[in-house]
Amino acid sequence: IDNSGNIMVGSFFLGNYLVKRDGRLSPLKGQFRGADAVEQDSKGNYYVSSWTSGTVWKIDSITEESTVLIDGLQSAADFYLEEDRGRLLLPDMMAGMIYAVDIDR
């Protein structure tokens, strides 16, 4: 659910992420295959994790350009956005690790 209460839909195999704009679902720029989690911060930026690629992206709310925050994990699963501390708490389930990922890049 985004900041306006709209649903966000991820296509696990195709890698598309759909968000509601002007009453219609529209894809964000980029491909996020294996998307597992999505969250939106107070500035409207999106964070998407990919279980299959072990990557987490930050997607700019205006330009929709994506920045890799972390990659090379065995499996980037659901995460917890701790915006007041400027981080995501991210489990790598396959490796048995939890990472604190800086979101202010």
Please state what every model-predicted region is:
Residues L89-R105:
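Short, basic/aromatic-enriched C-terminal tail that caps enzymatic domains
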Residues N16-Y17, T55-W57, M97-D102:
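Structural motif
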Residues E65-S66, R87-L89:
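Short, well-ordered strand-loop elements centered on a beta-strand within folded domains, enriched
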